[in-house]
């Protein structure tokens, strides 16, 4: 890891010195983490930019896998025109050792590196680290090897002390959408869990105490989209109407639910930072992607993308249809 001072002639300073291919990775995930936990950056700056936190991956005990590399066409690799080369990387198969992971912090002013005192069991994972809005509180998310126990710790980046804030356990496994649906606010944070059989939204204070369960029912919350502190409303997407569809909703502080998307099909939303507006991306079996700008009550203000030409072209084709059958537990 290097730091570059953009305001001082792009001068560089080296943070870590033990990185080596197929041995130690600092701040970037190994193959398993990229593939299974869907992220490619394992470092975070504190909100005041005084501290850098990163995950260290020690791959030295992970078995290697090698496959041949040929010249190919695009891209063409000239050195392999006559004889193939090979590529070797760390690839743990079932039951083999994973990388040993640890969390470290770097004080940018004093240049002191510290290892966080994280109680991670043998073979455990650290799928995310993220600073809260408090620069002295680093959130560390962990999973056990079986991936059926999730722990959220808050760590002091200087003292390295960790405190368990939330633990979530499952008889089967913890879904990966937990990680990125945790959003931190000054005094609270969001959390999603299948603890009652369906994936629902929960609201915690910053110390890890449950305030309330925001959503409930026989449906799944797909994504938490944000919270508006001015009116106390929560915004999210769910498949409440049908497992085959998704829609955008909000719930106010009194628990009143309002559907914000007006089209039947697949809806996803991107909200402005003040939660006053959102872009809604919609599509269905017979309607190509339409993107609209809406206010936070669901009113469409303008259409940004309508794909009218593509829709007109598709009108000349027969679209697929589907039938929904309900199976009973006794059916085979």
What are these regions (language model features)?
Residues 22-38, 121-126, 171-178, 219-223, ...:
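Short glycine-/Asp-/Thr-/Trp-enriched loop segments that recur within the blades
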Residues 39, 99, 125, 178, ...:
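Beta-rich catalytic cores
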Residues 6-8, 108-111, 157-158, 205-207, ...:
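Short loop/turn segments that connect beta-strands within beta-propeller blades
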């Amino acid at each position: 890891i290097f730091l570059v001072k953009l305001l001082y002639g792009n001068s560089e300073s080296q943070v870590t010195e033990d990185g080596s291919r197929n041995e130690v990775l600092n701040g970037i995930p190994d193959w398993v983490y990229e593939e299974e936990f869907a992220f490619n950056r394992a470092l975070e700056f504190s909100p005041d930019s005084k501290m850098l936190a990163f995950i260290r991956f020690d791959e030295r005990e992970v078995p290697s896998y090698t496959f041949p590399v040929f010249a190919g066409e695009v891209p063409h690799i000239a050195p392999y025109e006559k004889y193939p080369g090979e590529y070797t990387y760390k690839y743990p198969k079932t039951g083999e050792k994973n990388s040993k992971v640890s969390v470290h912090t770097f004080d940018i002013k004093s240049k002191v590196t510290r290892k966080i005192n994280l109680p991670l069991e043998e073979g455990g994972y650290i799928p995310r680290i993220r600073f809260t809005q408090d620069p002295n509180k680093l959130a560390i998310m962990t999973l056990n090897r079986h991936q059926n126990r999730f722990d959220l710790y808050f760590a002091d980046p200087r003292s390295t002390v960790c405190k368990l804030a939330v633990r979530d356990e499952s008889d089967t496994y913890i879904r990966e959408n937990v990680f990125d649906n945790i959003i931190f606010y000054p005094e609270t944070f969001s959390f999603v869990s299948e603890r009652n059989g369906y994936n629902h939204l929960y609201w915690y204070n910053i110390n890890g105490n449950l305030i309330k369960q925001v959503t409930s029912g026989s449906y799944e919350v797909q994504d938490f989209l944000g919270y508006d502190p001015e009116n106390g409303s929560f915004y999210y997407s769910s498949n409440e109407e049908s497992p085959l569809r998704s829609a955008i909703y909000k719930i106010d502080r009194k628990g009143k639910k309002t559907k914000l998307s007006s089209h039947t099909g697949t809806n996803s939303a991107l909200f402005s930072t003040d939660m006053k507006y959102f872009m809604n991306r919609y599509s269905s079996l017979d309607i190509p992607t339409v993107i609209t700008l809406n206010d936070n009550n669901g009113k469409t203000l303008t259409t940004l993308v309508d794909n009218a030409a593509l829709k007109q072209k598709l009108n000349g084709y027969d679209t697929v249809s589907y039938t929904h059958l309900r199976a009973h537990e006794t059916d085979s």
